[in-house]
C-alpha cells in the first residue's frame, strides 16, 4: 500500500512540473500574439495600397502581361504550403497539410502536375516521412516571419513561373496557409497567387472609385515594377497571418494541456488520499486484531 502512495506522489509531482511548463508556454504565446496581430494590422495599409494600384493598372489598361494572362493550358501548378517550425500548437500544421492534400488531389484530378514548395519544418517532416518530393523548403522563424524571406520565396516562385515547362516551369501558383480571424478562429485557406487574381484584404466599397493613373513611360514597365512587389506583399501577408494563427493555436493548446494537468493532479490526489485512508484502516484493523488476540 505504501508503494502505491509513493507512485501517486511521483505522478502528482511530475504532472505539477509539466503544468508549470504548459503555463509558461501559454503566457509566452499570449504575449507574442499581440505583437503578431500588430504586425498583421501594420502590413494592411501597404498591401491594400499596392493592391489598389495593381487593380487600377490591370482594369484601365489593355495589356497582355504574362503575370496577368491566363494560359491556354495549365500543365503544372506550384503549391506553397506554409506550416510551423515547432509543434505544441494543436492541429495547426495538420489542418494546413490536410488542406494542401485536398488541393493536390483537385489539381491532379484536373490533369495538372504539382510542384510543391514548403515553409516550416513540420511540412518538411511530413513530406520526408512519406518520401515525397518538394522543390524547395524554407525553415526558421515561422512564428516571426521577415520580409526578406517573403522576397526570397517570391523570387523563387516568379522564376519558376517565368521558366519554360521543359525547364521545370509552372503555369500557376497556389498558396496554402492559415488565415487569422480571431483568437478562437483560424481558417486553413487557399489562394491563387498567379496568374494574377487581385484580392484586397479589406476591399473598398463599391461606391469608391479606383484612382486614375497616367503611365510613364509604358504600362508594361509599371506592371513589371508593381507585380513583383504585389506578390511579395501577398506572401508576407500570408506568412504574418500564419504566424498569428500559429501562436493562437499554441496558446489554446497549452491552456488545454494545463487544464488537463490540473484535472490529473486532482485525480491522483484523490487516489492517493483513498490509498492512504485504506492503509490507515488496515493498520487500525491489525492493531485491534492484535489487541483482541492478547486479551484472549
Curated annotation (Swiss-Prot):
GO terms for cellular component: plasma membrane; proton-transporting ATP synthase complex. It comes from the Bacteria. It is found in: Cell membrane. InterPro entries: ATP_synth_F1_ATPase_gsu, ATP_synth_F1_gsu, ATP_synth_F1_gsu_CS. The keyword Nucleotide-binding does not apply. Transmembrane segments: none annotated. One of its GO terms (biological process) is proton motive force-driven plasma membrane ATP synthesis. GO terms for molecular function: ATP binding; proton-transporting ATP synthase activity, rotational mechanism. Pfam families: ATP-synt. It is a peripheral membrane protein. The keyword Ion transport applies. Keywords: ATP synthesis, Cell membrane, CF(1), Hydrogen ion transport, Ion transport, Membrane, Transport. Belongs to the ATPase gamma chain family. Produces ATP from ADP in the presence of a proton gradient across the membrane. The gamma chain is believed to be important in regulating ATPase activity and the flow of protons through the CF(0) complex. F-type ATPases have 2 components, CF(1) - the catalytic core - and CF(0) - the membrane proton channel. CF(1) has five subunits: alpha(3), beta(3), gamma(1), delta(1), epsilon(1). CF(0) has three main subunits: a, b and c. This is ATP synthase gamma chain. The lineage of its organism: Bacteria, Bacillati, Actinomycetota, Actinomycetes, Micrococcales. The gene is atpG.
Amino acid at each position: 500500500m505504501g508503494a502505491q502512495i509513493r507512485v501517486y506522489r511521483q505522478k502528482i509531482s511530475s504532472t505539477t512540473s509539466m503544468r508549470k511548463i504548459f503555463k509558461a508556454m501559454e503566457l509566452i504565446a499570449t504575449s507574442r500574439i499581440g505583437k503578431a496581430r500588430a504586425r498583421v494590422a501594420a502590413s494592411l495599409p501597404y498591401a491594400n495600397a499596392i493592391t489598389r494600384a495593381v487593380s487600377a493598372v490591370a482594369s484601365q489598361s489593355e495589356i497582355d502581361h504574362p503575370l496577368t494572362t491566363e494560359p491556354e493550358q495549365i500543365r503544372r501548378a506550384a503549391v506553397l504550403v506554409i506550416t510551423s517550425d515547432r509543434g505544441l500548437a494543436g492541429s495547426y500544421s495538420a489542418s494546413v497539410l490536410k488542406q494542401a492534400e485536398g488541393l493536390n488531389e483537385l489539381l491532379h484530378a484536373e490533369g495538372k502536375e504539382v510542384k510543391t514548395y514548403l515553409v516550416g519544418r513540420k511540412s518538411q517532416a511530413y513530406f520526408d516521412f512519406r518520401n515525397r518530393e518538394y522543390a524547395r523548403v524554407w525553415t526558421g522563424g515561422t512564428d516571426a516571419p521577415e520580409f526578406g524571406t517573403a522576397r526570397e520565396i517570391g523570387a523563387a516562385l516568379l522564376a519558376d513561373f517565368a521558366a519554360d515547362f521543359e525547364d521545370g516551369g509552372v503555369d500557376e501558383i497556389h498558396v496554402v496557409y492559415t488565415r487569422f480571424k480571431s483568437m478562437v478562429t483560424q481558417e486553413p485557406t487557399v489562394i491563387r497567387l498567379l496568374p494574377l487574381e487581385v484580392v484586397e484584404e479589406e476591399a473598398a466599397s463599391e461606391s469608391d472609385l479606383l484612382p486614375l493613373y497616367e503611365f510613364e513611360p509604358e504600362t508594361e514597365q509599371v506592371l513589371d515594377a508593381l507585380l513583383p512587389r504585389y506578390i511579395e506583399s501577398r506572401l508576407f501577408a500570408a506568412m504574418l497571418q500564419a504566424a498569428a494563427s500559429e501562436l493562437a493555436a499554441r496558446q489554446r493548446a497549452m491552456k488545454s494541456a494545463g487544464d488537463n494537468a490540473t484535472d490529473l493532479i486532482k485525480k491522483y490526489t484523490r487516489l492517493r488520499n483513498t490509498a492512504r485512508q485504506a492503509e490507515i484502516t488496515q493498520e487500525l484493523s491489525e492493531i485491534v486484531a492484535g489487541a483482541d488476540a492478547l486479551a484472549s
